[in-house]
A protein has these predicted regions:
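Alpha-helical interaction elements in eukaryotic regulators
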Residues: 22-25, 140, 144, 148, ...
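Acidic, polar low-complexity intrinsically disordered regions
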Residues: 29-177
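Structured partner-binding subdomains within large eukaryotic complex subunits
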Residues: 165-305
Length: 353
């Protein structure tokens, strides 16, 4: 899948897309197509849930123009960043007496300028779309994805500008520490109020860990955390929208309520008492918070096998393949993730999503 179409909503006979006009209920769709169970053979990298029509207003010609203009800027900035690195006249440290700026300061000025120019191009062609990024481990992804998708269609996220969500399926060579990326799409990610409203719901009603807001233009350009330009891969970091204390308070309130055993479908913040918001999905949140281990349900179980007589055999083969992969990877000295984006959080000894 190329960078140009990673964010394009599939059309035609791609069966891993749900819309309000689909002939199956959302719950059935989510039960049938679980990201931990759908193996990406190169033809089904994503599972999509769409709230309504695509609200993005650019044309294919606009997208081509965006790519051409922004690519020139990116090449220019990348070359300048490399020149700064190799320029001996620019000091490593700034000098207050002479007023000389450090390499880091000069580099960051160029990167800020590039971000501003990218935004100008985005507004010029109305290429303003983008997404909130989240990550979850394979063992937790099904519940977390189901919670998000349900919220988008029938829960508090339905009252936001978010119009679509997608989750990465499981690569054939997934290692034991694999993380699935989840994207929640907005027509205008430069609308700070809109993305912040959704952020509060994702924290307070779901307890999710968030990795920032990324413009589709940046995906189109291939800008990630390892890009040689050093341009930040997200246009909004969590701290740009809310302070750490507020973020932690919302998550603490969610998990405190969860610990107390309360369970109800949450209202949106606009319709509910801000001091009395309930979690959207207790089971999904439990998957995102460490707790006493219990015997888990077979992750290969499915609720609907009617359309595939060989499904049971495929599951057994897939389970054996996953077990073999896990054993092989544990014996390896290297552990390389294969997620679509480079913004995923670094994994520590304690596994979390």
């Amino acid at each position: 899948m190329t960078k140009a179409n990673e964010d394009a909503i599939p059309e035609g006979d791609y069966k891993y897309v749900w819309t309000p006009t689909s002939n199956v209920p959302l719950d059935d769709f989510l039960s049938k197509y679980k990201p931990s169970m759908v193996e990406n053979d190169g033809t089904k990298p994503w599972i999509w849930v769409r709230k309504g029509g695509d609200t993005r207003s650019f044309t294919p010609a606009d997208e081509i123009a965006v790519l051409e203009e922004s690519s020139k800027i990116l090449t220019e900035i990348t070359d300048q960043i490399e020149n700064i690195k190799n320029d001996p006249s620019i000091p490593t440290r700034s000098n207050k007496k002479t007023g000389a700026k450090s390499k880091k300061e000069v580099r960051e000025e160029l990167q800020r300028d590039a971000r501003e120019r990218f935004e100008e191009i985005a507004r010029k062609y109305k290429y303003l779309c983008g997404k909130w990024l989240m990550f979850a481990s394979t063992e937790k992804i099904d519940m977390i994805w189901s919670s998000l998708a349900t919220s988008l269609i029938n829960g508090p996220l339905a009252d936001t500008d978010a119009f679509c969500a997608k989750v990465a399926t499981t690569p054939r060579d997934a290692n034991p520490n694999h993380l699935h990326v989840i994207c929640l799409y907005f027509p205008d990610v430069y609308n700070k109020d809109a993305v912040t409203k959704a952020m509060k719901i994702l924290l307070r009603n779901h307890g999710f860990n968030l990795s920032g807001v990324k413009s589709d233009m940046y995906t189109l350009l291939g800008i990630d955390s390892k890009h040689p330009s050093g341009i930040p891969s997200t246009i909004w970091k969590n701290k740009d929208l809310m302070d750490d204390k507020e973020i932690q308070a919302l998550k603490d309130a969610f998990f405190a309520e969860l610990k107390g055993g309360k369970s109800s479908i949450a209202q949106s913040p606009d319709k509910a008492d801000p001091n009395d918001k309930k979690p959207m999905d207790v089971s999904a949140a439990s998957a995102d918070k460490p707790k006493t281990k219990r015997k888990q349900k077979d992750i290969f179980a499915s609720d609907d096998d009617d359309d595939n007589d060989g499904e049971q055999k495929r599951r057994a083969e897939l389970m054996q393949k996953k077990k073999a992969t896990a054993v092989s990877k544990r014996r390896s000295d290297k552990d390389k993730d294969s997620d679509e984006d480079q913004e995923k959080p670094k994994r520590k000894a304690a596994r979390r999503s």
